[in-house]
């Protein structure tokens, strides 16, 4: 996937970049794998904002993705590589020999016509999914499960990858994209390869309107609000925040304040903390 640059014909286009979508092979998704996706706009069932800066954006349909990769021993062939508006990675449509169709995350170098398979007997090949115990040390993986059978939860964004570092009893050591080294049950599955569309992080939005197309609403600084709206608000002109450390809108310390729960149950699985 390449990056497309534009001539500065307008201020919005001056620094804007987009994907060239060279890897995409079709613009029509598989209808049987679509589901309706209603707008939440960051509200809960009471209509109260629980996530700020969300709302608007283009209408989308959800693509049902196979994160579990539990169709063991049945080979499938890549039919298309498609764009998914709900995630940064591209997706691949797999046609299995028994007639079933499924979407999977498209790893880097996966092409139309290639064969993929799941299960303990699958080869160590791009796009295949195996239990971690069957994956050799040093292999690059993505879409890693945290509990066997639950489906992949880690390393699913565009361009991300993890590496199998070693095996200790019923656990496997995995180094994640953040640098964190973590123990994962060896029965958990992972897919071989790096997630595709690795150029995604280089895209420049270019203008505010394009963020709105993506469903992102503006972020307003607390210092320009009123005291009733934010701890940093109020004062005459450009005033300091008046606190010994920056605060969130709800009065909690922020910017460097550790928010991870102390003595969290999963702490025992973290061998080395992520890089700062």
Curated annotation (Swiss-Prot):
The record's listing under SMART domains reads: Ribosomal_L2, Ribosomal_L2_C
A biological process term (GO) from this entry: cytoplasmic translation
The biased composition feature labelled Polar residues covers 7-20
Q: Name one GO cellular component term.
A: large ribosomal subunit
The similarity annotation says:
Belongs to the universal ribosomal protein uL2 family.
Region annotation (Disordered) ranges: 1-20, 219-276
Per UniProt, the keywords (alphabetical) are: Ribonucleoprotein, Ribosomal protein, RNA-binding, rRNA-binding
GO MF annotation: an example:
rRNA binding
Q: Which InterPro entries match?
A: NA-bd_OB-fold (IPR012340), Rib_uL2_dom2 (IPR014722), Ribosomal_uL2 (IPR002171), Ribosomal_uL2_bac/org-type (IPR005880), Ribosomal_uL2_C (IPR022669), Ribosomal_uL2_CS (IPR022671), Ribosomal_uL2_dom3 (IPR014726), Ribosomal_uL2_RNA-bd_dom (IPR022666)
Free-text function comment from the UniProt entry:
One of the primary rRNA binding proteins. Required for association of the 30S and 50S subunits to form the 70S ribosome, for tRNA binding and peptide bond formation. It has been suggested to have peptidyltransferase activity; this is somewhat controversial. Makes several contacts with the 16S rRNA in the 70S ribosome.
Q: Which organism is it from?
A: Bacillus cereus (strain ATCC 14579 / DSM 31 / CCUG 7414 / JCM 2152 / NBRC 15305 / NCIMB 9373 / NCTC 2599 / NRRL B-3711)
Q: What is this protein called?
A: Large ribosomal subunit protein uL2
Tell me the classification of the organism that encodes this protein.
Bacteria, Bacillati, Bacillota, Bacilli, Bacillales
How is the quaternary structure described?
A: Part of the 50S ribosomal subunit. Forms a bridge to the 30S subunit in the 70S ribosome.
